[in-house]
Amino acid sequence: MQDHNKQGAFSWNELLTKDVEGARKFYTEVLGWTTEDMSMGDMGTYTIFKVGDEQVGGMMQMPPEVEQMGAPPYWGPYISVDDVDATVAKVESLGGKVLAPPMDAEGVGRFATVQDPQGAVFGIIKNA
């Protein structure tokens, strides 16, 4: 079994969608996933996708600012790092961009969204 918290390991996948209920229906019926909703306070609801008891990904309503940029719904990977802030600095020093600065989410960890010099977007996370 892979240690998802190990530096450099893909650790999470997250769907940003314009239709949470439609996506829920699609993925539960196609893949047999179950879902569990959790409140994010002012940010709305976050849906966890599960296979049995194992959490395999998450889903949330696409933020308005992302939708206004014309982005289609998409899956985004998260890669585990030992230090989010140091990794963000390294991304910038190597020609990448920070799209969402480091932030903390209680019970989740510290994370940021970055873009490599070629334009590929991914999240980095230090799990709680």
Language-model segments: residues:
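N-terminal beta-strand motif that seeds the catalytic metal site of vicinal oxygen chelate
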Residues: 1-24, 74-77, 125-128
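Intrinsically disordered, low-complexity segments enriched in polar/charged residues with Gly/Pro
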Residues: 2, 33-37, 66, 89, ...
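Core segments of cupin and vicinal oxygen chelate
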Residues: 7, 14-54, 93
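A short, local hydrophobic-aromatic micro-motif
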Residues: 11, 36, 57, 75, ...
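Conserved beta-strand and immediately adjacent loop positions that scaffold enzyme active sites
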Residues: 12, 45-46, 76, 111, ...
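Vicinal oxygen chelate
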Residues: 19-21, 50-55, 77-118
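Short acidic, gly/pro-rich beta-turn/loop elements at beta-sheet edges
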Residues: 23-25, 59, 69, 87-89, ...
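Conserved short beta-strand elements that form part of the metal-binding/catalytic scaffold
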Residues: 33-72, 121-126
